[in-house]
Amino acid sequence: MAKKAGSKLPKRKEEFTYRGYRVSELAKMRLEEIAELLPSRQRRTLRRGLSKEHRKFMAKLRARGTAKTHLRDAIVLPEMVGKVVEIHNGKTFQRVEIIPEMIGHYLGEYALTRARVIHGAAGVGATRSSKFVPLK
């Protein structure tokens, strides 16, 4: 069978690059080199150095491939890509798989702390007109 001239082929997903570097290239870089590619707020944070808690979290993530954390201010680094992190949102841990598009963002951005409020129907006496509605 011949293909139609107007039929479209499925698009191939392009490989993700961060500032012109592939994830495999970023993973080989030192922390100082990665910091130079990040936005200024994240760059300043990394220049100050990782805290003891951050280093402990990264070691746990390297060893197991998954880790629970309360460190919402941790920056997603290239070595975290493909790992699963459970981020605390103030009540529970939300499971998040790190993908390349998350590099340079904070972990807290992916575990929302506030839920959308969904109100139920108003009860009897909630409004002035509902006072005269007969009860069942």
Swiss-Prot record:
Q: What is this protein called?
A: Small ribosomal subunit protein uS19
Statement: the UniProt record of this protein carries the keyword Nucleotidyltransferase = no
What Pfam families does its record include? Ribosomal_S19 (PF00203)
The UniProt keyword set, sorted, is: Ribonucleoprotein, Ribosomal protein, RNA-binding, rRNA-binding
Single GO cellular component annotation? cytosolic small ribosomal subunit
The record ties this protein, via Gene3D superfamilies, to: 30s Ribosomal Protein S19, Chain A
Q: What does the record give under GO molecular function?
A: rRNA binding; structural constituent of ribosome
Q: State the species of origin.
A: Methanothrix thermoacetophila (strain DSM 6194 / JCM 14653 / NBRC 101360 / PT) (Methanosaeta thermophila)
| Single biological process term from Gene Ontology | translation
Taxonomically, which superkingdom?
A: Archaea
| Similarity comment text for this entry | Belongs to the universal ribosomal protein uS19 family.
- Carries keyword Nucleotide-binding? no
| Matching HAMAP family | Ribosomal_uS19 (MF_00531)
Its annotated function is as follows: Protein S19 forms a complex with S13 that binds strongly to the 16S ribosomal RNA.
